[in-house]
């Protein structure tokens, strides 16, 4: 059985330092036509408790994408529901 390789992305912080993250999942919301991504720092990916970061993103023409902070409570609630669903599926 082959191990599934996780997608990894580099996200610069506000100081321009680059950090490697492992993508947990992405999802689209049809009603708002927005896309979201949840990531964890690559060095924490195998730990039992990890800090999850979530962003809204827009894909660019050159296969890159731009990340935007999630600012509204409604958006956060939606992302948290997706994280909870994912956690429940992994426990099953």
Swiss-Prot record:
Domain of life: Bacteria
InterPro entries: UPF0473
Entry similarity comment: Belongs to the UPF0473 family.
Protein name listed in UniProt: UPF0473 protein OB2006
Species: Oceanobacillus iheyensis (strain DSM 14371 / CIP 107618 / JCM 11309 / KCTC 3954 / HTE831)
